[in-house]
């Protein structure tokens, strides 16, 4: 048998340079962002800060500042594991993932709460269910913290960010299961409609959106 090889096209090496906006003092910037939210925090509250499974640059510094800001209001910060089905959707799996990222009570000075039980809290007009982890009902206020970026699998007005953190992350295994059961064309609608349902039912104070540059 004769082997036929196709000639390779001509190639050239290139160098691509991306825009590189930077925040030189991460802690100072995070303190400034938290000042927008702290007027809504009352002494004695328990405030849940979401933590997820994605590796985000400088996330420990940002979480540390958020914990300090909440505590400075006379409130008690807790870290709510919010990663959908990651970590196998189990409490121990979630803890293992967070431990690997350095997100621990010892490092950040706030309890880390894992949970694998979800509750249906409502339904959208289009028949989508809003799920929420039981752990979210143990706090007086929720502040989602997440990176905002384009999604690798679908395009829409809302992709990866704070809405997805609420719908899929805090939605736990139930929210993640519904998300992954739908076609790509339906996912932006799910994120928008279910987020509206969650905001109407849960004490979400606001969120911190993180943007990373290409480096």
Residue ranges and their predicted role:
Residues 93-157:
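An acidic, phosphate/nucleotide-engaging active-site surface
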Residues 132-134, 142, 148-215:
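Catalytic cores of enzyme domains
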């Amino acid at each position: 048998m004769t082997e036929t090889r196709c000639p390779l096209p001509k190639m050239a090496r290139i160098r691509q340079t991306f825009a590189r906006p930077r925040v030189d003092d991460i802690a100072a910037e995070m303190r400034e962002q938290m000042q927008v939210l702290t007027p809504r925090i009352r002494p004695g509250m328990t405030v849940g800060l979401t933590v997820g499974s994605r590796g985000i640059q400088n996330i420990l510094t940002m979480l540390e500042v958020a914990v300090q800001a909440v505590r400075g209001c006379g409130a008690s910060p807790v870290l709510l594991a919010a990663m959908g089905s990651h970590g196998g959707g189990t409490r121990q799996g979630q803890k293992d993932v967070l431990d690997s990222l350095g997100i621990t009570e010892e490092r950040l000075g706030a309890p880390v709460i894992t949970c694998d039980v979800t509750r249906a809290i409502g339904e959208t007009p289009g028949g989508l269910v809003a799920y929420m982890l039981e752990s979210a009902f143990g706090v007086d206020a929720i502040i989602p913290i997440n990176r905002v970026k384009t999604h690798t699998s679908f395009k829409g007005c809302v992709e990866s960010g704070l809405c997805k953190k609420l719908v899929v992350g805090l939605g736990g295994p139930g929210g993640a299961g519904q998300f992954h059961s739908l076609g790509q064309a339906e996912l932006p609608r799910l994120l928008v409609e279910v987020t509206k349902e969650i905001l109407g039912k849960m004490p979400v104070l606001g969120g911190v959106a993180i943007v990373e540059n290409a480096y």
